Amino acid sequence: MLLLISPDGVEEALACATAAEHLDIVDVKKPDEGSLGANFPWVIREIRAAVPADKPVSATVGDVPYKPGTVAQAALGAAVSGATYIKVGLYGCATPDQAIDVMRGVVRAVKDFRADAFVVASGYADAHRIGCVNPLALPDIARRAGADAAMLDTAIKDGTRLFDHVPPEGCAEFVRLAHEAGLLAALAGSVKAADLATLTRIGTDIVGVRGAVCEGGDRDAGRIQPRLVAAFRAEMDRHARAFAAAPAAS
């Protein structure tokens, strides 16, 4: 399982660089603009320069409306600015067909520029609260659009969490559908260390966190701390070892 950490600017990216051995992907977002709020192009460039070259940089394009052309341009901007993972929050897409329209534009724009770019179609575990596409539709949307991964996050950051809206068995189905479609499955949404056993068991490929590695567990007021990144990774590795050993022990 890969660990994706989301700094909100260059200062926190430098903290991630200090803890680079413990993480896999540095994800650029702007939390005050939403769950998948997009940051400025120059911030993406500065963060790309700040973190080790062997660590991929991801960038969110935003909690986007159903405006395929607008979103495709934004996605290309993120790629030009140095991101290799491009995440799109399908916030304003009420139907799978709308979501596919948006994602096809993103895939073409980004991969025409950089063939090895990695495109992530992101939905929301709490989709029922905002009227967007069903979370379990995301793997098929991503597959039909030519994306590389399907992701779930939470749209409304009010203390509720991924498993509050899509229980573990639902997340397991999401992962299964993603894998059947040949995609990676990414899960986020106020994920905590206590969730890692379940996330490991269901076969999650990428776990995305912010609050769990911030002071006080606060994604907004807290700052990312290298020691908390290291501690979270240690828990990931512990659960991975335990899961790998379980069949042999049984």
From Swiss-Prot:
InterPro entries listed in its UniProt record: 4HFCP_synth, RibuloseP-bd_barrel
Entry EC no(s): 4.2.3.153
Active site: 29 (schiff-base intermediate with substrate), 87 (proton acceptor)
Enzyme class name: lyase
Coiled-coil stretches noted in the UniProt entry, renumbered to this chain: none
Keyword terms: Lyase, Schiff base
Catalysis: reaction(s): 2 D-glyceraldehyde 3-phosphate = 4-(hydroxymethyl)-2-furancarboxaldehyde phosphate + phosphate + 2 H2O
Gene Ontology molecular function: any one: lyase activity
Role, per record: Catalyzes the formation of 4-(hydroxymethyl)-2-furancarboxaldehyde phosphate (4-HFC-P) from two molecules of glyceraldehyde-3-P (GA-3-P).
Family designation: Belongs to the MfnB family.
Protein name in UniProt: Putative (5-formylfuran-3-yl)methyl phosphate synthase
Organism: Streptomyces griseus subsp. griseus (strain JCM 4626 / CBS 651.72 / NBRC 13350 / KCC S-0626 / ISP 5235)
Organism classification: Bacteria, Bacillati, Actinomycetota, Actinomycetes, Kitasatosporales
